[in-house]
Amino acid sequence: MDKNKNISMAVIKRLPKYHRYLNELMKNDVDRISSKELGEKIGFTASQIRQDLNCFGDFGQQGYGYNVKELYTQINSILGLDKEYNAVLIGAGNIGQAIANYSRFDKLGIMITAIFDANPKLIGIKIRDIEIRDIDELGSFLKSDSVDIGVICVPKKSAQKVSDELVNGGIRGIWNFAPIDLVVPEDVKVENVHLSESVSTLIYQLHQQR
């Protein structure tokens, strides 16, 4: 893949859905699938799927469709899921603990190597054999260990400070669960998961049905 190619974020955000469905197809021993069949399963048009995949190369064959395993492997590589990424999690409250206990991260190549919190009652407790550390140790940990991703699960008032420390520690990817839009340098990538915004969208759709 040409890393300089200008591909819209909308296309990138659809790739994980393709990836997930292709994985399910492999589990069901499906060897090949057409763009029409794939579209019917995931709610996209066949044309949309072809356009998305053509951004990264020529994967399908006319009259044959897509080889499921080959397409899965290609998308896996495009998304960077064929590599490993070390992550630190900051905030071991309910959301943080749920994320730390999510077993599928290992399959995505994401390894949570440390967990930090400011609550003295949580420090020393283990989650999946990872001991929760004092938040004051975050800076020194980032200096001594290679970390790719910071997962922020702290309250809004603490999130920007944590983000600044992650950036100063060399992290270039932040997964943010705090209800705030972080201010970061241009070369730092942030993926926000604002739960209130997500549920508000659902409520709006329910409201329109009344």
Swiss-Prot record:
Pfam families: CoA_binding (PF02629), Put_DNA-bind_N (PF06971)
DNA-binding is among the record's keywords: yes
HAMAP family referenced in this protein's UniProt entry, alphabetically: Rex (MF_01131)
Biological role: Modulates transcription in response to changes in cellular NADH/NAD(+) redox state.
UniProt keyword list: Cytoplasm, DNA-binding, NAD, Repressor, Transcription, Transcription regulation
GO molecular function, one term: DNA binding
Gene name in the database record: rex
Residues reported to bind NAD(+): 91-96
Keyword Transmembrane (UniProt): no
PANTHER family per the UniProt record, alphabetical: REDOX-SENSING TRANSCRIPTIONAL REPRESSOR REX, REDOX-SENSING TRANSCRIPTIONAL REPRESSOR REX 1
Subunit structure of this chain's protein: Homodimer.
DNA-binding region(s) from the entry: 17-56
NCBIfam families referenced in this protein's UniProt entry, alphabetically: PRK05472.1-3 (NF003989), PRK05472.1-4 (NF003990), PRK05472.2-2 (NF003993), PRK05472.2-3 (NF003994), PRK05472.2-4 (NF003995), PRK05472.2-5 (NF003996)
One GO-annotated biological process of the protein: response to redox state
Intracellular or extracellular location(s): Cytoplasm
Lineage: Bacteria, Bacillati, Bacillota, Clostridia, Eubacteriales
Name this protein carries in UniProt: Redox-sensing transcriptional repressor Rex
Predominant localisation class: cytoplasm
Family from the record: Belongs to the transcriptional regulatory Rex family.
GO cellular component: cytoplasm
